[in-house]
Amino acid sequence: MASRASELPPGSGRSVTAGIIIVGDEILKGHTQDTNTYFLCRTLRSLGVQVCRVSVVPDEVATIASEVNSFSRRFTHVLTAGGIGPTHDDVTFEAVAQAFGEELKPHPELQAAIKTLGGEGWEKLSMVPSSARLHYGTDPRTGHPFRFPLVSVRNVYLFPGIPELLRRVLEGLKGLFQNTAVQFHLKELYVAASEGSIAPILSEAQAHFGRRLSLGSYPDWSSNYFQVKLILDSEEKEPLEECLAYLTARLPQGSLVPYQPDAVEKAGEAVYKLAESGSCLGKKVAGALQTIETALAQYHLSQLCVGFNGGKDCTALLHLFHAAVQRKFPDVPKPLQILYIRSISPFPELEQFLQDTIKRYNLQVLEAEGNMKQALGELQEKHPQLEAVLMGTRRTDPYSCSLSHFSPTDPGWPSFMRINPLLDWTYRNIWEFLRQLFVPYCILYDRGYTSLGSRENTTQNPALKCLSPGGHPVYRPAYLLENEDEERNSRM
Protein backbone atom coordinates (compact mmCIF):
# COMPACT_ATOMS: atom_id res chain seq x y z
CA MET A 1 0.00 0.00 0.00
CA ALA A 2 1.30 3.47 -0.86
CA SER A 3 0.56 6.76 0.85
CA ARG A 4 1.51 10.41 0.69
CA ALA A 5 2.87 12.01 3.84
CA SER A 6 -0.35 13.96 4.31
CA GLU A 7 -2.55 10.85 4.18
CA LEU A 8 -1.58 9.63 7.63
CA PRO A 9 -2.96 11.72 10.52
CA PRO A 10 -0.35 13.33 12.77
CA GLY A 11 -0.08 12.26 16.37
CA SER A 12 -2.98 13.65 18.33
CA GLY A 13 -2.24 12.47 21.85
CA ARG A 14 -0.28 14.44 24.42
CA SER A 15 2.44 11.78 24.51
CA VAL A 16 3.97 10.61 21.26
CA THR A 17 7.16 8.61 21.69
CA ALA A 18 9.85 7.24 19.42
CA GLY A 19 12.64 4.71 19.52
CA ILE A 20 15.58 4.88 17.11
CA ILE A 21 17.53 1.83 15.93
CA ILE A 22 20.83 2.52 14.17
CA VAL A 23 21.91 -0.49 12.11
CA GLY A 24 25.49 -1.14 11.09
CA ASP A 25 28.67 -2.97 12.01
CA GLU A 26 30.57 0.09 10.78
CA ILE A 27 29.15 2.16 13.65
CA LEU A 28 29.94 -0.39 16.35
CA LYS A 29 33.47 -0.92 15.02
CA GLY A 30 34.20 2.79 14.83
CA HIS A 31 34.67 2.79 11.07
CA THR A 32 31.94 5.40 10.55
CA GLN A 33 30.80 8.27 12.77
CA ASP A 34 27.07 8.22 13.47
CA THR A 35 25.50 11.61 12.70
CA ASN A 36 22.01 10.26 12.04
CA THR A 37 21.10 9.94 15.72
CA TYR A 38 21.65 13.64 16.39
CA PHE A 39 19.58 14.70 13.39
CA LEU A 40 16.74 12.27 14.10
CA CYS A 41 16.51 13.22 17.78
CA ARG A 42 16.62 16.95 17.10
CA THR A 43 14.06 16.80 14.28
CA LEU A 44 11.63 14.53 16.11
CA ARG A 45 11.85 16.77 19.17
CA SER A 46 10.91 19.76 17.02
CA LEU A 47 7.86 17.79 15.84
CA GLY A 48 6.61 17.21 19.40
CA VAL A 49 7.89 13.63 19.60
CA GLN A 50 9.73 12.40 22.69
CA VAL A 51 12.66 10.14 21.77
CA CYS A 52 12.89 7.60 24.60
CA ARG A 53 15.58 5.18 23.45
CA VAL A 54 18.38 4.89 20.90
CA SER A 55 19.94 1.51 20.11
CA VAL A 56 22.88 0.64 17.86
CA VAL A 57 22.82 -2.93 16.55
CA PRO A 58 25.04 -5.00 14.22
CA ASP A 59 24.10 -6.26 10.76
CA GLU A 60 22.53 -9.41 12.21
CA VAL A 61 18.98 -10.40 11.30
CA ALA A 62 18.07 -11.92 14.67
CA THR A 63 19.45 -9.00 16.69
CA ILE A 64 17.71 -6.37 14.56
CA ALA A 65 14.45 -8.35 14.61
CA SER A 66 14.50 -8.65 18.39
CA GLU A 67 15.11 -4.92 18.86
CA VAL A 68 12.44 -3.95 16.32
CA ASN A 69 9.89 -6.22 17.98
CA SER A 70 10.66 -4.78 21.41
CA PHE A 71 10.68 -1.14 20.28
CA SER A 72 7.47 -1.46 18.25
CA ARG A 73 5.54 -2.55 21.37
CA ARG A 74 6.97 0.21 23.58
CA PHE A 75 6.94 3.33 21.40
CA THR A 76 4.53 5.18 19.13
CA HIS A 77 7.05 5.28 16.29
CA VAL A 78 10.18 3.27 15.57
CA LEU A 79 12.73 4.64 13.11
CA THR A 80 15.55 2.47 11.81
CA ALA A 81 18.53 3.86 9.91
CA GLY A 82 20.87 1.74 7.83
CA GLY A 83 20.98 -1.80 6.50
CA ILE A 84 19.09 -0.92 3.31
CA GLY A 85 20.87 -1.61 0.04
CA PRO A 86 21.89 -4.26 -2.49
CA THR A 87 24.68 -6.04 -0.61
CA HIS A 88 24.82 -9.11 1.63
CA ASP A 89 25.00 -7.08 4.85
CA ASP A 90 21.89 -5.00 4.05
CA VAL A 91 19.43 -7.06 6.09
CA THR A 92 17.01 -4.58 7.66
CA PHE A 93 14.03 -5.52 5.46
CA GLU A 94 14.58 -9.20 6.23
CA ALA A 95 14.95 -8.51 9.95
CA VAL A 96 11.75 -6.45 10.15
CA ALA A 97 9.85 -9.19 8.33
CA GLN A 98 11.14 -11.69 10.89
CA ALA A 99 10.19 -9.36 13.75
CA PHE A 100 6.54 -9.48 12.70
CA GLY A 101 6.43 -13.04 11.36
CA GLU A 102 6.01 -11.94 7.75
CA GLU A 103 7.50 -13.04 4.45
CA LEU A 104 9.60 -10.95 2.11
CA LYS A 105 7.75 -10.34 -1.14
CA PRO A 106 8.54 -8.30 -4.25
CA HIS A 107 6.58 -5.03 -4.31
CA PRO A 108 5.42 -3.98 -7.80
CA GLU A 109 5.83 -0.24 -7.13
CA LEU A 110 9.37 -0.72 -5.85
CA GLN A 111 10.22 -2.89 -8.83
CA ALA A 112 8.94 -0.17 -11.15
CA ALA A 113 10.85 2.54 -9.26
CA ILE A 114 14.11 0.57 -9.44
CA LYS A 115 13.60 0.00 -13.15
CA THR A 116 12.90 3.71 -13.74
CA LEU A 117 16.01 4.71 -11.81
CA GLY A 118 18.11 2.21 -13.75
CA GLY A 119 19.36 0.64 -10.54
CA GLU A 120 21.15 -2.42 -11.85
CA GLY A 121 21.84 -4.85 -9.04
CA TRP A 122 19.37 -3.11 -6.71
CA GLU A 123 16.53 -5.63 -7.12
CA LYS A 124 16.98 -6.60 -3.47
CA LEU A 125 15.37 -3.29 -2.49
CA SER A 126 12.04 -4.42 -3.94
CA MET A 127 11.83 -7.36 -1.49
CA VAL A 128 9.93 -6.02 1.53
CA PRO A 129 7.73 -7.44 4.31
CA SER A 130 4.28 -8.40 3.02
CA SER A 131 2.42 -5.67 4.97
CA ALA A 132 4.80 -2.89 3.92
CA ARG A 133 3.46 0.57 3.18
CA LEU A 134 5.14 3.08 0.87
CA HIS A 135 5.33 6.81 1.60
CA TYR A 136 6.08 9.30 -1.16
CA GLY A 137 7.13 12.59 0.37
CA THR A 138 8.39 15.76 -1.30
CA ASP A 139 12.10 16.32 -1.77
CA PRO A 140 12.86 19.61 0.09
CA ARG A 141 15.67 20.39 -2.37
CA THR A 142 13.65 20.11 -5.58
CA GLY A 143 10.01 20.40 -4.52
CA HIS A 144 9.25 17.23 -6.49
CA PRO A 145 7.97 13.92 -5.07
CA PHE A 146 10.62 11.41 -4.12
CA ARG A 147 11.30 8.92 -6.88
CA PHE A 148 11.82 6.14 -4.34
CA PRO A 149 9.51 5.85 -1.32
CA LEU A 150 10.12 5.32 2.37
CA VAL A 151 9.04 1.84 3.48
CA SER A 152 7.19 1.26 6.74
CA VAL A 153 5.85 -1.87 8.43
CA ARG A 154 3.22 -1.24 11.12
CA ASN A 155 4.76 1.56 13.24
CA VAL A 156 8.34 0.97 12.04
CA TYR A 157 9.85 3.32 9.43
CA LEU A 158 12.91 2.10 7.56
CA PHE A 159 15.23 4.98 6.68
CA PRO A 160 18.40 4.81 4.57
CA GLY A 161 21.66 5.02 6.50
CA ILE A 162 23.32 7.59 4.22
CA PRO A 163 23.02 10.84 6.23
CA GLU A 164 22.19 13.09 3.27
CA LEU A 165 19.42 10.77 2.07
CA LEU A 166 18.04 10.25 5.57
CA ARG A 167 17.80 13.99 6.16
CA ARG A 168 16.04 14.64 2.89
CA VAL A 169 13.56 11.82 3.48
CA LEU A 170 12.69 12.91 7.02
CA GLU A 171 12.38 16.55 5.96
CA GLY A 172 10.02 15.48 3.18
CA LEU A 173 7.91 13.24 5.42
CA LYS A 174 7.63 15.24 8.64
CA GLY A 175 3.87 14.91 8.49
CA LEU A 176 4.13 11.24 9.40
CA PHE A 177 5.45 12.12 12.85
CA GLN A 178 4.09 15.60 13.67
CA ASN A 179 2.42 15.77 17.08
CA THR A 180 0.35 18.95 17.06
CA ALA A 181 -0.71 18.52 20.70
CA VAL A 182 2.77 19.12 22.06
CA GLN A 183 5.42 21.75 21.43
CA PHE A 184 8.62 21.41 23.41
CA HIS A 185 10.17 24.64 24.67
CA LEU A 186 13.88 24.88 25.34
CA LYS A 187 16.21 27.47 26.80
CA GLU A 188 19.99 27.26 27.06
CA LEU A 189 21.95 29.05 29.78
CA TYR A 190 25.73 29.38 29.96
CA VAL A 191 27.44 29.60 33.33
CA ALA A 192 31.00 30.73 34.02
CA ALA A 193 31.35 28.67 37.20
CA SER A 194 32.34 25.09 37.90
CA GLU A 195 29.64 22.43 37.85
CA GLY A 196 30.52 21.34 41.38
CA SER A 197 30.04 24.83 42.78
CA ILE A 198 26.52 25.20 41.35
CA ALA A 199 25.34 21.59 41.80
CA PRO A 200 23.37 22.32 45.03
CA ILE A 201 21.54 25.19 43.33
CA LEU A 202 20.62 22.99 40.37
CA SER A 203 19.36 20.21 42.65
CA GLU A 204 17.19 22.70 44.53
CA ALA A 205 15.83 24.08 41.25
CA GLN A 206 14.89 20.64 39.90
CA ALA A 207 13.20 19.73 43.17
CA HIS A 208 11.33 23.04 43.20
CA PHE A 209 9.94 22.72 39.67
CA GLY A 210 9.54 18.94 39.69
CA ARG A 211 7.99 17.43 36.59
CA ARG A 212 7.10 20.82 35.14
CA LEU A 213 10.49 20.96 33.45
CA SER A 214 13.72 19.09 32.89
CA LEU A 215 16.99 20.73 33.94
CA GLY A 216 20.15 19.32 32.38
CA SER A 217 23.71 20.30 33.30
CA TYR A 218 26.56 19.77 30.83
CA PRO A 219 30.16 20.76 31.66
CA ASP A 220 32.35 22.08 28.86
CA TRP A 221 36.10 22.03 29.38
CA SER A 222 37.00 23.54 26.03
CA SER A 223 34.92 26.72 25.94
CA ASN A 224 36.59 30.11 26.27
CA TYR A 225 33.44 31.64 27.72
CA PHE A 226 31.61 29.26 30.04
CA GLN A 227 32.14 26.11 32.10
CA VAL A 228 28.64 24.69 32.20
CA LYS A 229 25.72 24.70 29.78
CA LEU A 230 22.28 24.37 31.35
CA ILE A 231 19.33 23.21 29.26
CA LEU A 232 15.81 23.94 30.48
CA ASP A 233 13.20 21.84 28.70
CA SER A 234 9.43 21.88 29.11
CA GLU A 235 6.13 21.48 27.28
CA GLU A 236 5.13 24.95 28.51
CA LYS A 237 6.83 28.35 28.38
CA GLU A 238 5.91 29.50 31.87
CA PRO A 239 8.09 27.04 33.82
CA LEU A 240 11.10 28.05 31.71
CA GLU A 241 10.67 31.72 32.53
CA GLU A 242 10.11 30.95 36.20
CA CYS A 243 13.18 28.72 36.35
CA LEU A 244 15.29 31.34 34.60
CA ALA A 245 14.33 33.89 37.25
CA TYR A 246 14.96 31.32 39.99
CA LEU A 247 18.46 30.51 38.73
CA THR A 248 19.37 34.13 38.00
CA ALA A 249 18.64 35.01 41.62
CA ARG A 250 20.69 32.13 43.04
CA LEU A 251 23.66 31.50 40.75
CA PRO A 252 26.89 33.40 41.54
CA GLN A 253 26.58 37.04 40.55
CA GLY A 254 27.87 37.64 37.02
CA SER A 255 28.22 33.93 36.25
CA LEU A 256 25.46 33.84 33.62
CA VAL A 257 27.09 34.59 30.27
CA PRO A 258 25.12 35.93 27.25
CA TYR A 259 27.02 33.46 25.08
CA GLN A 260 26.15 33.16 21.38
CA PRO A 261 26.81 29.59 20.17
CA ASP A 262 26.25 30.58 16.53
CA ALA A 263 28.90 33.33 16.45
CA VAL A 264 30.46 31.97 13.25
CA GLU A 265 27.18 31.35 11.43
CA LYS A 266 25.96 34.88 12.23
CA ALA A 267 29.31 36.62 11.86
CA GLY A 268 28.19 38.86 9.01
CA GLU A 269 25.31 40.27 11.03
CA ALA A 270 27.18 40.70 14.33
CA VAL A 271 30.44 42.10 12.94
CA TYR A 272 28.74 44.69 10.75
CA LYS A 273 26.43 45.69 13.60
CA LEU A 274 29.52 46.34 15.73
CA ALA A 275 31.15 48.28 12.87
CA GLU A 276 28.10 50.54 12.64
CA SER A 277 27.85 51.11 16.41
CA GLY A 278 30.11 54.17 16.45
CA SER A 279 32.06 52.89 19.47
CA CYS A 280 35.85 53.07 19.59
CA LEU A 281 36.08 49.35 18.84
CA GLY A 282 33.37 49.69 16.20
CA LYS A 283 35.46 52.26 14.34
CA LYS A 284 38.44 49.90 14.33
CA VAL A 285 36.21 47.12 12.99
CA ALA A 286 34.80 49.42 10.31
CA GLY A 287 38.32 50.34 9.18
CA ALA A 288 39.38 46.70 8.99
CA LEU A 289 36.26 45.79 7.03
CA GLN A 290 36.92 48.62 4.59
CA THR A 291 40.39 47.18 3.89
CA ILE A 292 38.96 43.69 3.44
CA GLU A 293 36.17 44.93 1.17
CA THR A 294 38.74 46.75 -0.97
CA ALA A 295 40.67 43.49 -1.27
CA LEU A 296 37.50 41.62 -2.26
CA ALA A 297 36.85 44.23 -4.95
CA GLN A 298 40.39 43.94 -6.35
CA TYR A 299 40.87 40.17 -6.13
CA HIS A 300 38.79 37.09 -6.78
CA LEU A 301 38.30 34.85 -3.73
CA SER A 302 40.49 32.20 -5.36
CA GLN A 303 43.35 34.75 -5.42
CA LEU A 304 43.15 35.45 -1.67
CA CYS A 305 44.13 33.52 1.42
CA VAL A 306 44.39 34.34 5.12
CA GLY A 307 47.66 33.75 6.94
CA PHE A 308 46.60 31.66 9.93
CA ASN A 309 48.68 30.08 12.68
CA GLY A 310 46.02 29.82 15.39
CA GLY A 311 47.06 33.01 17.19
CA LYS A 312 44.67 35.64 18.54
CA ASP A 313 45.37 38.23 15.82
CA CYS A 314 44.81 35.93 12.86
CA THR A 315 41.76 34.46 14.60
CA ALA A 316 40.24 37.95 14.75
CA LEU A 317 41.27 38.53 11.12
CA LEU A 318 39.73 35.26 9.96
CA HIS A 319 36.44 36.13 11.67
CA LEU A 320 36.44 39.58 10.03
CA PHE A 321 37.22 38.11 6.61
CA HIS A 322 34.56 35.44 7.04
CA ALA A 323 32.01 38.12 7.97
CA ALA A 324 32.88 40.28 4.96
CA VAL A 325 32.68 37.32 2.58
CA GLN A 326 29.43 36.21 4.20
CA ARG A 327 27.98 39.68 3.58
CA LYS A 328 29.27 40.04 0.00
CA PHE A 329 28.74 36.42 -1.11
CA PRO A 330 25.89 34.86 0.94
CA ASP A 331 26.31 31.57 -0.93
CA VAL A 332 30.07 31.05 -1.14
CA PRO A 333 30.69 28.31 -3.72
CA LYS A 334 33.90 26.99 -2.14
CA PRO A 335 35.78 27.10 1.20
CA LEU A 336 37.86 30.11 2.21
CA GLN A 337 41.61 29.54 1.91
CA ILE A 338 44.11 29.85 4.76
CA LEU A 339 47.89 29.60 4.72
CA TYR A 340 49.15 27.54 7.64
CA ILE A 341 52.90 27.49 8.24
CA ARG A 342 53.60 24.50 10.45
CA SER A 343 56.16 25.07 13.21
CA ILE A 344 58.70 22.42 14.20
CA SER A 345 57.05 21.59 17.52
CA PRO A 346 53.53 23.02 17.69
CA PHE A 347 51.40 22.91 20.82
CA PRO A 348 48.86 20.03 20.66
CA GLU A 349 46.20 22.52 21.79
CA LEU A 350 47.08 24.76 18.85
CA GLU A 351 46.86 21.86 16.41
CA GLN A 352 43.45 20.91 17.83
CA PHE A 353 42.27 24.51 17.56
CA LEU A 354 43.33 24.55 13.92
CA GLN A 355 41.25 21.45 13.18
CA ASP A 356 38.25 22.88 15.02
CA THR A 357 38.59 26.18 13.15
CA ILE A 358 38.73 24.43 9.78
CA LYS A 359 35.37 22.82 10.55
CA ARG A 360 33.78 25.95 12.02
CA TYR A 361 34.61 28.21 9.09
CA ASN A 362 34.69 25.60 6.31
CA LEU A 363 38.31 26.28 5.35
CA GLN A 364 40.71 24.93 2.78
CA VAL A 365 44.20 24.67 4.29
CA LEU A 366 47.22 25.53 2.17
CA GLU A 367 50.03 24.12 4.28
CA ALA A 368 53.69 25.11 4.07
CA GLU A 369 56.87 24.75 6.13
CA GLY A 370 59.93 26.84 6.90
CA ASN A 371 60.22 30.56 7.57
CA MET A 372 57.85 33.10 6.04
CA LYS A 373 59.94 33.61 2.90
CA GLN A 374 60.24 29.87 2.28
CA ALA A 375 56.54 29.35 2.96
CA LEU A 376 55.49 32.05 0.51
CA GLY A 377 57.76 30.53 -2.12
CA GLU A 378 56.19 27.11 -1.59
CA LEU A 379 52.74 28.69 -1.68
CA GLN A 380 53.47 30.43 -4.98
CA GLU A 381 54.80 27.24 -6.53
CA LYS A 382 51.87 25.05 -5.46
CA HIS A 383 49.11 27.63 -5.89
CA PRO A 384 50.09 30.03 -8.68
CA GLN A 385 46.60 31.55 -8.78
CA LEU A 386 47.17 33.25 -5.40
CA GLU A 387 48.10 36.92 -5.51
CA ALA A 388 47.46 38.28 -2.01
CA VAL A 389 47.69 37.15 1.61
CA LEU A 390 45.70 38.76 4.43
CA MET A 391 47.89 39.06 7.52
CA GLY A 392 47.03 39.68 11.17
CA THR A 393 49.96 42.08 11.55
CA ARG A 394 49.77 45.07 13.93
CA ARG A 395 52.12 48.07 13.96
CA THR A 396 53.37 47.04 17.40
CA ASP A 397 54.67 43.76 15.96
CA PRO A 398 58.42 43.55 15.23
CA TYR A 399 59.47 45.24 11.95
CA SER A 400 55.91 46.34 11.19
CA CYS A 401 55.73 50.04 12.07
CA SER A 402 56.30 51.21 8.48
CA LEU A 403 53.79 48.89 6.80
CA SER A 404 50.63 50.10 5.07
CA HIS A 405 47.31 48.31 4.67
CA PHE A 406 48.41 47.10 1.22
CA SER A 407 52.14 46.32 1.17
CA PRO A 408 53.84 44.33 -1.61
CA THR A 409 56.47 41.87 -0.44
CA ASP A 410 60.05 43.15 -0.43
CA PRO A 411 62.39 42.74 -3.42
CA GLY A 412 63.87 39.25 -3.52
CA TRP A 413 60.77 37.74 -1.92
CA PRO A 414 58.01 35.78 -3.70
CA SER A 415 55.69 38.36 -5.21
CA PHE A 416 52.52 38.77 -3.14
CA MET A 417 50.40 41.64 -1.90
CA ARG A 418 50.32 41.64 1.89
CA ILE A 419 46.99 42.95 3.14
CA ASN A 420 46.98 44.18 6.75
CA PRO A 421 43.45 45.02 7.98
CA LEU A 422 44.49 45.02 11.68
CA LEU A 423 47.47 47.32 11.31
CA ASP A 424 46.07 50.02 13.62
CA TRP A 425 44.58 47.67 16.19
CA THR A 426 45.97 47.24 19.70
CA TYR A 427 46.31 44.15 21.87
CA ARG A 428 43.26 45.36 23.80
CA ASN A 429 41.25 45.82 20.57
CA ILE A 430 41.91 42.22 19.57
CA TRP A 431 40.65 40.85 22.86
CA GLU A 432 37.65 43.18 23.01
CA PHE A 433 36.63 42.04 19.52
CA LEU A 434 37.04 38.32 20.23
CA ARG A 435 35.36 38.38 23.63
CA GLN A 436 32.52 40.73 22.71
CA LEU A 437 31.48 38.58 19.74
CA PHE A 438 32.19 35.25 21.49
CA VAL A 439 34.66 34.17 18.82
CA PRO A 440 36.34 30.84 19.71
CA TYR A 441 40.11 31.15 20.22
CA CYS A 442 42.95 28.83 21.25
CA ILE A 443 42.52 27.60 24.83
CA LEU A 444 46.19 28.34 25.60
CA TYR A 445 45.31 32.03 25.92
CA ASP A 446 43.08 31.15 28.86
CA ARG A 447 46.08 29.50 30.54
CA GLY A 448 48.35 32.52 30.67
CA TYR A 449 49.96 32.55 27.22
CA THR A 450 49.79 35.95 25.49
CA SER A 451 51.79 35.32 22.30
CA LEU A 452 52.02 31.87 20.71
CA GLY A 453 54.93 30.34 18.86
CA SER A 454 56.32 26.81 19.18
CA ARG A 455 56.74 24.85 22.41
CA GLU A 456 60.47 25.66 22.34
CA ASN A 457 60.11 29.44 22.37
CA THR A 458 56.81 30.07 24.17
CA THR A 459 56.00 30.16 27.89
CA GLN A 460 53.21 31.47 30.06
CA ASN A 461 53.47 35.20 30.67
CA PRO A 462 54.91 35.92 34.14
CA ALA A 463 52.86 39.14 34.26
CA LEU A 464 49.73 36.98 34.54
CA LYS A 465 50.99 34.76 37.36
CA CYS A 466 49.00 34.88 40.59
CA LEU A 467 47.92 32.70 43.51
CA SER A 468 44.72 30.68 43.60
CA PRO A 469 42.40 30.86 46.65
CA GLY A 470 44.20 27.74 47.86
CA GLY A 471 47.60 29.41 47.59
CA HIS A 472 48.77 27.61 44.44
CA PRO A 473 50.42 29.50 41.55
CA VAL A 474 48.09 29.91 38.56
CA TYR A 475 47.92 32.14 35.49
CA ARG A 476 45.14 34.53 34.58
CA PRO A 477 43.86 34.54 30.97
CA ALA A 478 45.58 36.64 28.32
CA TYR A 479 42.72 39.12 27.96
CA LEU A 480 43.39 40.30 31.53
CA LEU A 481 46.95 41.48 30.76
CA GLU A 482 47.09 45.08 31.97
CA ASN A 483 50.29 46.33 30.32
CA GLU A 484 50.19 45.70 26.56
CA ASP A 485 53.95 46.22 26.35
CA GLU A 486 54.32 42.90 28.18
CA GLU A 487 52.46 40.96 25.48
CA ARG A 488 55.54 39.28 24.04
CA ASN A 489 56.96 38.30 27.43
CA SER A 490 55.60 34.84 26.54
CA ARG A 491 58.29 34.48 23.89
CA MET A 492 61.84 33.40 24.68
Swiss-Prot record:
Pathway: Cofactor biosynthesis; FAD biosynthesis; FAD from FMN: step 1/1. Signal peptide: none annotated. It holds the Pfam family MoCF_biosynth. Keywords: Acetylation, ATP-binding, Cytoplasm, FAD, Flavoprotein, FMN, Nucleotide-binding, Nucleotidyltransferase, Phosphoprotein, Transferase. Residues 303-460 are annotated as: FAD synthase. InterPro entries: FAD_synth_MoaB/Mog-bd, FLAD1_M, MoaB/Mog-like_dom_sf, MoaB/Mog_dom, PAPS_reduct_dom, Rossmann-like_a/b/a_fold. Its main location: cytoplasm. This is FAD synthase. The gene is Flad1.
